[in-house]
Amino acid sequence: MKSVGAFVRERRRANQMSQHALAELAGVSQPFISELERGKPTVRLDAVNRVLAVFGKQVGVVDAPRPEVHP
């Protein structure tokens, strides 16, 4: 599975966009784009979703198998 940062970098380059141009479109700073692409952890899901929205994507919550709990 590809990381969010790797996805953003790949899509940005495929669209021949600079980090600055993507930041302007998404309403975030260029350093935020740089940090996101490098995989720096963030709790700013609102900002991550604004970046992903430029490419028609978003972060969401999906059901996952629950780990078995042994008392």
Regions found by a protein language model. Name each.
Residues 6-21, 25:
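Short basic helix-loop element that most often maps to the first helix and adjoining turn
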Residues 1-3:
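A detector for short, charged/polar N-terminal pre-domain segments
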